């Protein structure tokens, strides 16, 4: 996987909602942004540059703009020179404020993109932070099929040829939705959430042995696909092995987990052999996961009932005598 990153040019080109207007520094549009954090350089503009986060996007709001306007020409030039001694990826003025002339001159000289936007500072920071969080999120690739089953993002894994795509195709025919086939791109958007998606090239397509490449959106309609989905369940399809059949889960009391990018996801292993209806088992697993999220564990409830029954039977069989 390539190292997550985004260029200034990509932000300018793909996100019209930011209302960015390039003032100068177009030669630096190829600068890469590698931090999702935003910096408001208020303290640095007073001359204190210790711990200056120059690797972040620099946002100058009303406060910074008003402070720079209050400085004498000599002091403004001094602060500007110190500020532009650092390598900066880009600078953005909010509220439609016009950048000070020394800032424009230095940005042009250093090749640092300088923007302004009509959006208020707080709103702008919220918007661009969401963009950076998505673009710079830790990510990995997994071989499998990601499908939404009863609202649960279900990642089907298993060795090649075990029947992942065929199972997913049957689920799609039943009304569930495809997210990604073959290679699933997984991003961690927070400490506990994983989002799965597909590359632009493979999106909405599946490979079925004997049929080739299928466009699921064209075959089953727009309601049969979606671009991304929260991963809430991993189901590993594994060929049935008689010698290890006793190792398969029989009660479901304990929930197995698999870790991806530091996030633990519920994990189920389903043995595959002729005669087993795997799609309906996957549907049932997804519905059961929804129940678990709601705090209802059928296996534990049954275990509690069984323990109560055994205790009552023991008392009836061996009554306590005075």
Swiss-Prot record:
Record flagged with keyword DNA-binding: no
Domain of life assignment: Bacteria
EC number(s) per entry: 2.7.11.-, 2.7.4.-
Catalytic reaction annotation: [HPr protein]-L-serine + ATP = [HPr protein]-O-phospho-L-serine + ADP + H(+); [HPr protein]-O-phospho-L-serine + phosphate + H(+) = [HPr protein]-L-serine + diphosphate
Pfam families reported in the protein's UniProt record: Hpr_kinase_C, Hpr_kinase_N
ATP-binding as UniProt keyword: yes
Cofactor names: Mg(2+)
Sorted UniProt keywords: ATP-binding, Kinase, Magnesium, Metal-binding, Multifunctional enzyme, Nucleotide-binding, Serine/threonine-protein kinase, Transferase
Description of how the protein assembles with itself and partners: Homohexamer.
Note: Both phosphorylation and phosphorolysis are carried out by the same active site and suggest a common mechanism for both reactions.
Record-linked PANTHER family: HPR KINASE_PHOSPHORYLASE, PROTEIN YJDM-RELATED
Protein name: HPr kinase/phosphorylase
Gene coding for it: hprK
